[in-house]
Amino acid sequence: MQNFWQKLDKPFFCLAPMSDVTDIAFRHMLAKYGKNRENRNKVVFWTEFVSADGLCNKLGRKKLSHMLEFSESERPIVAQVFGANGDNMKKACQYVASLGFDGIDINMGCPDKSVVNQGAGAGMIKNPKLAREIIQAVHAGIKSAGCHIPVSVKTRTGFNKEGIDTWIPELLKEDISALTIHLRTAKELSLVPANWDHIKKIKELIKKSGKDILLIGNGDVVDIDDAKRKCEKYGCDGVMIGRGVFGNPWLFRRGVASKETWERDGASTRNFLVKKYPCSLEATPLKERLQVMLEHTRFFEKMLGKHKSFDVMKKHFKAYVNGFEGAKELRVKLMETENAEQVEDVVNDFLKL
Protein backbone atom coordinates (compact mmCIF):
# COMPACT_ATOMS: atom_id res chain seq x y z
CA MET A 1 0.00 0.00 0.00
CA GLN A 2 1.36 3.40 -0.97
CA ASN A 3 1.97 5.95 1.75
CA PHE A 4 1.38 9.65 1.23
CA TRP A 5 5.04 10.33 0.39
CA GLN A 6 4.79 8.12 -2.67
CA LYS A 7 1.73 10.00 -3.91
CA LEU A 8 3.30 13.46 -3.87
CA ASP A 9 3.97 15.35 -7.08
CA LYS A 10 7.60 16.35 -7.55
CA PRO A 11 9.12 18.65 -6.70
CA PHE A 12 7.23 19.06 -3.44
CA PHE A 13 7.63 21.62 -0.68
CA CYS A 14 7.63 21.20 3.08
CA LEU A 15 6.92 23.51 5.99
CA ALA A 16 9.83 23.20 8.42
CA PRO A 17 9.04 22.34 12.03
CA MET A 18 9.87 25.43 14.08
CA SER A 19 9.23 25.81 17.79
CA ASP A 20 6.67 28.51 18.60
CA VAL A 21 6.25 29.22 14.89
CA THR A 22 4.56 26.32 13.10
CA ASP A 23 1.81 25.97 15.68
CA ILE A 24 -1.81 25.30 14.74
CA ALA A 25 -2.54 29.03 14.40
CA PHE A 26 0.16 29.68 11.81
CA ARG A 27 -0.52 26.41 10.00
CA HIS A 28 -4.18 27.41 9.80
CA MET A 29 -3.16 30.59 8.01
CA LEU A 30 -0.79 28.72 5.71
CA ALA A 31 -3.49 26.20 4.84
CA LYS A 32 -6.11 28.88 4.21
CA TYR A 33 -3.93 31.15 2.08
CA GLY A 34 -1.29 28.75 0.81
CA LYS A 35 -2.96 25.45 -0.04
CA ASN A 36 -5.44 24.77 -2.83
CA ARG A 37 -6.51 21.91 -5.08
CA GLU A 38 -3.66 22.54 -7.46
CA ASN A 39 -0.85 22.26 -4.90
CA ARG A 40 -2.28 19.98 -2.21
CA ASN A 41 -0.15 17.08 -3.46
CA LYS A 42 2.94 19.25 -3.45
CA VAL A 43 2.88 20.79 0.04
CA VAL A 44 3.57 18.93 3.30
CA PHE A 45 3.13 20.49 6.73
CA TRP A 46 5.11 19.65 9.88
CA THR A 47 4.07 20.31 13.46
CA GLU A 48 6.38 21.89 16.00
CA PHE A 49 8.68 19.24 17.45
CA VAL A 50 7.23 17.50 20.50
CA SER A 51 9.04 15.75 23.33
CA ALA A 52 8.36 12.01 23.45
CA ASP A 53 9.31 11.97 27.13
CA GLY A 54 6.76 14.70 27.80
CA LEU A 55 4.01 12.74 26.07
CA CYS A 56 4.61 9.73 28.28
CA ASN A 57 3.08 11.11 31.45
CA LYS A 58 -0.45 12.35 32.04
CA LEU A 59 0.51 15.89 33.04
CA GLY A 60 3.00 16.29 30.19
CA ARG A 61 0.55 14.99 27.61
CA LYS A 62 -2.09 17.44 28.79
CA LYS A 63 0.43 20.29 28.59
CA LEU A 64 1.66 19.34 25.11
CA SER A 65 -1.63 18.25 23.52
CA HIS A 66 -2.18 21.60 21.76
CA MET A 67 1.02 20.99 19.77
CA LEU A 68 -0.57 17.94 18.17
CA GLU A 69 -3.86 19.50 17.11
CA PHE A 70 -4.46 19.93 13.39
CA SER A 71 -7.25 20.37 10.87
CA GLU A 72 -8.10 18.39 7.74
CA SER A 73 -7.18 21.39 5.58
CA GLU A 74 -3.54 20.95 6.61
CA ARG A 75 -3.13 17.46 5.13
CA PRO A 76 -0.76 15.94 4.43
CA ILE A 77 0.70 16.72 7.85
CA VAL A 78 3.57 15.09 9.70
CA ALA A 79 4.06 15.10 13.47
CA GLN A 80 7.67 15.57 14.55
CA VAL A 81 8.88 14.00 17.79
CA PHE A 82 12.22 13.91 19.55
CA GLY A 83 13.68 11.77 22.30
CA ALA A 84 16.49 9.36 23.13
CA ASN A 85 14.57 6.78 25.15
CA GLY A 86 13.34 3.94 22.96
CA ASP A 87 10.53 2.88 25.27
CA ASN A 88 9.22 6.43 25.52
CA MET A 89 9.49 6.95 21.76
CA LYS A 90 7.45 3.81 21.18
CA LYS A 91 4.81 4.81 23.72
CA ALA A 92 4.64 8.40 22.49
CA CYS A 93 4.40 7.44 18.83
CA GLN A 94 1.64 4.95 19.57
CA TYR A 95 -0.33 7.91 20.90
CA VAL A 96 0.70 10.28 18.10
CA ALA A 97 -0.18 7.75 15.40
CA SER A 98 -3.64 7.30 16.91
CA LEU A 99 -4.35 11.01 16.35
CA GLY A 100 -4.53 10.56 12.58
CA PHE A 101 -1.33 12.14 11.28
CA ASP A 102 -0.16 11.20 7.80
CA GLY A 103 3.34 10.42 9.04
CA ILE A 104 5.76 10.73 11.93
CA ASP A 105 9.14 12.44 11.61
CA ILE A 106 12.02 11.98 14.04
CA ASN A 107 14.07 15.04 14.87
CA MET A 108 17.75 14.12 14.70
CA GLY A 109 19.01 17.57 13.85
CA CYS A 110 18.06 20.10 16.53
CA PRO A 111 21.32 21.63 17.85
CA ASP A 112 19.79 23.19 20.97
CA LYS A 113 21.92 22.20 23.97
CA SER A 114 18.92 21.29 26.10
CA VAL A 115 17.91 18.73 23.47
CA VAL A 116 21.41 17.51 22.57
CA ASN A 117 22.27 16.96 26.24
CA GLN A 118 19.44 14.43 26.37
CA GLY A 119 21.08 12.56 23.51
CA ALA A 120 18.19 13.61 21.28
CA GLY A 121 18.02 15.90 18.25
CA ALA A 122 21.49 16.39 16.75
CA GLY A 123 22.85 14.35 19.65
CA MET A 124 21.73 11.29 17.68
CA ILE A 125 24.43 12.00 15.11
CA LYS A 126 27.00 11.00 17.73
CA ASN A 127 25.20 7.75 18.47
CA PRO A 128 24.14 6.03 15.21
CA LYS A 129 23.31 2.78 17.01
CA LEU A 130 20.80 4.54 19.23
CA ALA A 131 19.44 6.46 16.25
CA ARG A 132 18.63 3.19 14.49
CA GLU A 133 17.00 1.82 17.64
CA ILE A 134 14.87 4.95 17.89
CA ILE A 135 13.62 4.52 14.31
CA GLN A 136 12.69 0.93 15.12
CA ALA A 137 10.92 2.05 18.30
CA VAL A 138 8.84 4.58 16.37
CA HIS A 139 7.75 1.88 13.93
CA ALA A 140 6.84 -0.36 16.86
CA GLY A 141 4.73 2.40 18.37
CA ILE A 142 2.89 2.99 15.10
CA LYS A 143 2.23 -0.73 14.76
CA SER A 144 0.90 -0.87 18.33
CA ALA A 145 -1.60 1.82 17.38
CA GLY A 146 -2.85 -0.35 14.52
CA CYS A 147 -1.68 2.22 11.98
CA HIS A 148 0.39 2.04 8.81
CA ILE A 149 1.87 5.51 8.49
CA PRO A 150 5.41 6.20 7.25
CA VAL A 151 8.42 7.27 9.30
CA SER A 152 10.86 9.95 8.18
CA VAL A 153 13.96 11.58 9.67
CA LYS A 154 15.20 15.17 9.70
CA THR A 155 18.90 15.59 10.45
CA ARG A 156 22.09 17.49 9.59
CA THR A 157 25.25 16.67 7.66
CA GLY A 158 27.21 16.01 10.85
CA PHE A 159 27.80 17.18 14.40
CA ASN A 160 31.10 19.04 14.81
CA LYS A 161 32.17 18.30 11.26
CA GLU A 162 30.68 16.91 8.07
CA GLY A 163 30.04 13.19 8.45
CA ILE A 164 27.83 12.29 5.53
CA ASP A 165 29.73 9.12 4.61
CA THR A 166 29.44 7.67 8.11
CA TRP A 167 26.18 9.09 9.48
CA ILE A 168 23.74 8.95 6.56
CA PRO A 169 24.34 5.26 5.62
CA GLU A 170 23.34 4.27 9.17
CA LEU A 171 19.96 5.94 8.74
CA LEU A 172 19.49 4.36 5.33
CA LYS A 173 19.74 0.90 6.88
CA GLU A 174 16.39 1.50 8.56
CA ASP A 175 12.85 1.76 7.18
CA ILE A 176 12.41 5.45 6.44
CA SER A 177 10.32 6.89 3.62
CA ALA A 178 11.91 10.33 3.48
CA LEU A 179 15.10 11.97 4.68
CA THR A 180 15.35 15.71 5.25
CA ILE A 181 18.87 17.11 5.40
CA HIS A 182 19.61 20.50 6.88
CA LEU A 183 22.76 21.18 4.90
CA ARG A 184 24.89 22.36 7.81
CA THR A 185 26.46 20.60 10.78
CA ALA A 186 25.03 21.00 14.26
CA LYS A 187 28.02 23.13 15.25
CA GLU A 188 27.39 25.49 12.34
CA LEU A 189 23.82 26.20 13.50
CA SER A 190 22.65 28.71 10.86
CA LEU A 191 25.80 30.83 11.02
CA VAL A 192 27.25 29.76 7.66
CA PRO A 193 25.64 29.22 4.24
CA ALA A 194 23.97 25.84 3.73
CA ASN A 195 26.09 23.58 1.52
CA TRP A 196 23.69 22.34 -1.14
CA ASP A 197 26.49 20.60 -3.00
CA HIS A 198 26.17 17.80 -0.42
CA ILE A 199 22.86 16.75 -2.00
CA LYS A 200 24.62 14.92 -4.83
CA LYS A 201 26.63 12.75 -2.44
CA ILE A 202 23.57 11.93 -0.34
CA LYS A 203 21.58 11.00 -3.44
CA GLU A 204 24.37 8.60 -4.39
CA LEU A 205 24.22 7.01 -0.94
CA ILE A 206 20.46 6.54 -1.24
CA LYS A 207 20.88 4.97 -4.67
CA LYS A 208 23.56 2.67 -3.30
CA SER A 209 21.21 1.57 -0.51
CA GLY A 210 18.77 0.27 -3.13
CA LYS A 211 15.85 1.88 -1.32
CA ASP A 212 13.18 4.26 -2.55
CA ILE A 213 13.79 7.05 -0.05
CA LEU A 214 12.82 10.62 -0.88
CA LEU A 215 15.45 13.29 -0.28
CA ILE A 216 14.44 16.73 1.00
CA GLY A 217 16.93 19.59 1.11
CA ASN A 218 16.78 22.30 3.77
CA GLY A 219 18.72 25.49 4.45
CA ASP A 220 18.68 29.09 3.20
CA VAL A 221 15.58 28.67 1.03
CA VAL A 222 14.05 32.06 0.26
CA ASP A 223 10.67 31.00 -1.14
CA ILE A 224 8.97 28.58 -3.55
CA ASP A 225 10.78 30.18 -6.46
CA ASP A 226 14.13 29.50 -4.83
CA ALA A 227 12.99 26.01 -3.80
CA LYS A 228 12.12 25.04 -7.37
CA ARG A 229 15.48 26.26 -8.64
CA LYS A 230 17.28 24.23 -5.97
CA CYS A 231 15.36 21.08 -6.93
CA GLU A 232 16.28 21.63 -10.57
CA LYS A 233 19.93 22.37 -9.84
CA TYR A 234 20.71 19.78 -7.17
CA GLY A 235 18.22 17.01 -7.91
CA CYS A 236 16.46 16.60 -4.57
CA ASP A 237 12.86 15.38 -4.53
CA GLY A 238 11.62 18.19 -2.35
CA VAL A 239 12.67 21.24 -0.39
CA MET A 240 11.85 22.28 3.16
CA ILE A 241 11.31 25.97 3.85
CA GLY A 242 11.82 27.46 7.30
CA ARG A 243 12.56 31.13 7.87
CA GLY A 244 11.36 32.01 4.36
CA VAL A 245 7.77 31.40 5.39
CA PHE A 246 7.75 33.95 8.22
CA GLY A 247 5.01 36.51 7.70
CA ASN A 248 4.07 35.02 4.34
CA PRO A 249 1.12 32.58 4.60
CA TRP A 250 0.66 32.96 0.83
CA LEU A 251 4.08 31.49 0.10
CA PHE A 252 3.09 27.98 -0.99
CA ARG A 253 0.65 29.13 -3.68
CA ARG A 254 2.71 31.92 -5.21
CA GLY A 255 3.67 31.94 -8.86
CA VAL A 256 7.34 31.94 -9.78
CA ALA A 257 9.56 34.33 -11.65
CA SER A 258 10.74 33.52 -15.13
CA LYS A 259 14.01 31.65 -15.56
CA GLU A 260 15.48 34.70 -17.29
CA THR A 261 14.55 37.01 -14.42
CA TRP A 262 15.97 34.59 -11.87
CA GLU A 263 19.26 34.14 -13.70
CA ARG A 264 19.65 37.87 -14.21
CA ASP A 265 18.87 39.04 -10.68
CA GLY A 266 19.54 36.05 -8.44
CA ALA A 267 17.86 35.22 -5.14
CA SER A 268 20.01 37.50 -3.03
CA THR A 269 19.63 40.66 -5.12
CA ARG A 270 15.91 40.75 -5.87
CA ASN A 271 14.08 44.03 -5.79
CA PHE A 272 10.77 42.18 -5.36
CA LEU A 273 8.79 43.88 -8.11
CA VAL A 274 5.43 42.15 -8.17
CA LYS A 275 5.42 41.36 -11.88
CA LYS A 276 8.91 39.89 -11.67
CA TYR A 277 8.56 38.04 -8.37
CA PRO A 278 4.96 37.01 -7.74
CA CYS A 279 6.17 34.71 -4.94
CA SER A 280 7.39 37.59 -2.78
CA LEU A 281 5.56 38.93 0.26
CA GLU A 282 5.57 42.34 -1.39
CA ALA A 283 3.18 40.95 -4.01
CA THR A 284 0.43 41.18 -1.39
CA PRO A 285 -1.27 44.58 -0.95
CA LEU A 286 -0.33 46.14 2.39
CA LYS A 287 -3.90 46.36 3.67
CA GLU A 288 -4.48 42.67 2.98
CA ARG A 289 -1.19 41.76 4.64
CA LEU A 290 -2.11 43.60 7.83
CA GLN A 291 -5.65 42.22 7.85
CA VAL A 292 -4.29 38.67 7.54
CA MET A 293 -1.85 39.40 10.36
CA LEU A 294 -4.81 40.45 12.48
CA GLU A 295 -6.72 37.31 11.51
CA HIS A 296 -3.68 35.25 12.50
CA THR A 297 -3.56 37.04 15.86
CA ARG A 298 -7.22 36.37 16.58
CA PHE A 299 -6.87 32.70 15.72
CA PHE A 300 -3.76 32.41 17.88
CA GLU A 301 -5.62 33.92 20.81
CA LYS A 302 -8.60 31.62 20.26
CA MET A 303 -6.64 28.39 19.86
CA LEU A 304 -3.53 28.96 21.94
CA GLY A 305 -4.30 31.80 24.34
CA LYS A 306 -4.43 29.38 27.27
CA HIS A 307 -1.23 27.60 26.28
CA LYS A 308 1.21 30.21 25.01
CA SER A 309 2.32 33.70 25.85
CA PHE A 310 1.03 36.42 23.53
CA ASP A 311 4.68 37.36 23.00
CA VAL A 312 4.92 34.38 20.62
CA MET A 313 2.88 36.37 18.11
CA LYS A 314 5.36 39.23 18.17
CA LYS A 315 7.96 37.37 16.13
CA HIS A 316 5.25 37.09 13.47
CA PHE A 317 4.50 40.81 13.71
CA LYS A 318 8.14 41.55 12.88
CA ALA A 319 7.82 39.47 9.71
CA TYR A 320 4.45 40.76 8.54
CA VAL A 321 5.38 44.40 9.18
CA ASN A 322 8.45 44.94 7.07
CA GLY A 323 9.55 46.67 3.90
CA PHE A 324 7.10 49.57 3.67
CA GLU A 325 6.93 53.19 4.80
CA GLY A 326 6.00 53.44 8.45
CA ALA A 327 6.80 49.79 9.17
CA LYS A 328 9.27 50.53 11.95
CA GLU A 329 6.85 52.77 13.82
CA LEU A 330 4.04 50.24 13.41
CA ARG A 331 6.23 47.41 14.72
CA VAL A 332 7.09 49.44 17.82
CA LYS A 333 3.38 49.87 18.60
CA LEU A 334 2.63 46.19 17.94
CA MET A 335 5.39 45.14 20.33
CA GLU A 336 3.48 46.92 23.10
CA THR A 337 0.21 45.04 22.52
CA GLU A 338 -1.06 42.32 24.83
CA ASN A 339 -4.06 40.90 22.97
CA ALA A 340 -5.83 40.75 19.61
CA GLU A 341 -8.14 43.65 20.43
CA GLN A 342 -5.18 45.96 20.95
CA VAL A 343 -3.58 44.73 17.72
CA GLU A 344 -6.81 45.53 15.87
CA ASP A 345 -6.80 49.07 17.24
CA VAL A 346 -3.17 49.62 16.21
CA VAL A 347 -3.74 48.24 12.70
CA ASN A 348 -6.92 50.26 12.15
CA ASP A 349 -5.21 53.46 13.29
CA PHE A 350 -2.35 52.82 10.88
CA LEU A 351 -4.64 52.13 7.92
CA LYS A 352 -6.49 55.41 8.54
CA LEU A 353 -3.32 57.44 8.03
Model-derived features: positions:
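Short glycine-enriched, charge-decorated loop/helix-capping segments at active-site entrances
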Residues: 64, 119-125, 188
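Conserved phosphate-coordination/catalytic loops
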Residues: 83, 125, 129, 193, ...
